[in-house]
């Protein structure tokens, strides 16, 4: 039971990392990215291949996965950044699905649908399953704490205020002299790096990854996390991720509680419950449990905000 609870906690931490990354892309910059699972997969596969095939240290693999996800994020952003709304969502979703199909069919990259197994974890053999899980939980929690403070500082920085200005009215931000394209690309790069970090940490914990793990449904879970916690709020992103993982795991026990419900029907009921939860959140908590709170820019000695920080 303890092993199961620790695994859930690690999963919640990974979801929190993804939610924090998406909070920058979607919550702050207003970019609708439905391909977040693609960047998650880039980080997982890059770190897994580098450590498993090349024998590189795990820290090097995680760093490489994070960096590569950021680079891919920049490339995708440069192609899609001038698109808006539904068009951006469709293109990013297409990127993630194309990546998943390629990884499924090209056996020479990562064994296709069989996936990568035996991905090393830090001191897994020396510590044994119990201590390894506790160690890894500490690593994931540390990563969440560091990323949380980075994103939280970003939210209240001049850069964060420009992103919110772009989200609220892109034309006004452009009229104020801000290079909208550059800011969008930077937001995409930062968020993609966080998604890649989450993917790398996930792969080294489970020691196995396959294309089926990176289905679009994962994107929905992270979106649900942000909507639950509150878009644009770092605390809300973490809270939403924890609540969504708790909800997903608790609904696994539906089958024994409902007489005559088969495993297949229980899985369908689980997805239905998730959909109902999303509708209820949108109905009663449109801005999330912890709505975005924008701090005013710092004042100068004259009592006015610096010109560069008014956006």
How should each PLM-predicted stretch be described?
Residues 1-311:
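Transmembrane alpha-helices and adjacent helix-loop boundaries
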């Amino acid at each position: 039971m303890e092993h199961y609870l620790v695994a859930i906690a690690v999963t919640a931490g990974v979801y929190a990392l993804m939610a924090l990354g998406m909070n920058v892309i979607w919550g702050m910059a207003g970019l609708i990215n439905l391909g977040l699972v693609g960047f998650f997969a880039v980080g997982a596969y890059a770190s897994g291949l580098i450590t498993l095939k090349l024998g590189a240290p795990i820290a090097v693999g995680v760093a490489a996965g994070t960096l590569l996800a950021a680079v891919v994020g920049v490339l995708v952003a440069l192609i899609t950044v001038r698109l808006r709304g539904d068009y951006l969502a469709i293109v990013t979703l297409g990127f993630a699905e194309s990546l998943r199909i390629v990884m499924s069919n090209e056996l020479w990259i990562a064994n296709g649908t069989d996936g990568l197994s035996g991905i090393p974890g830090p001191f897994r053999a020396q510590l044994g399953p119990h201590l390894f899980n506790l160690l890894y939980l500490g690593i994931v929690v540390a990563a969440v704490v560091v990323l949380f403070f980075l994103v939280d500082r970003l939210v209240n920085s001049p850069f964060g205020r420009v992103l919110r200005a772009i989200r609220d009215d892109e034309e006004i931000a452009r009229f104020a002299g801000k290079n909208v394209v550059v800011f969008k690309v930077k937001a995409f790069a930062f968020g993609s790096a966080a998604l890649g970090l989450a993917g790398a940490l996930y792969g080294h914990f489970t020691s196995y990854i396959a294309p089926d793990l990176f289905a679009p449904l994962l994107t929905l879970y992270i979106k649900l996390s942000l909507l639950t916690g509150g878009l644009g709020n770092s605390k809300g992103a973490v809270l939403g991720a924890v609540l969504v993982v708790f909800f997903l795991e608790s609904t696994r026990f539906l089958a024994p509680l409902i007489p005559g419900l088969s495993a297949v029907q229980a899985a369908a009921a689980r997805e239905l419950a998730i959909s109902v939860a999303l509708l209820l959140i949108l109905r009663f908590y449109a801005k999330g449990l912890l709505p975005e709170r924008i701090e005013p820019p710092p004042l100068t000695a004259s009592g006015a905000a610096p010109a560069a920080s008014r956006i």
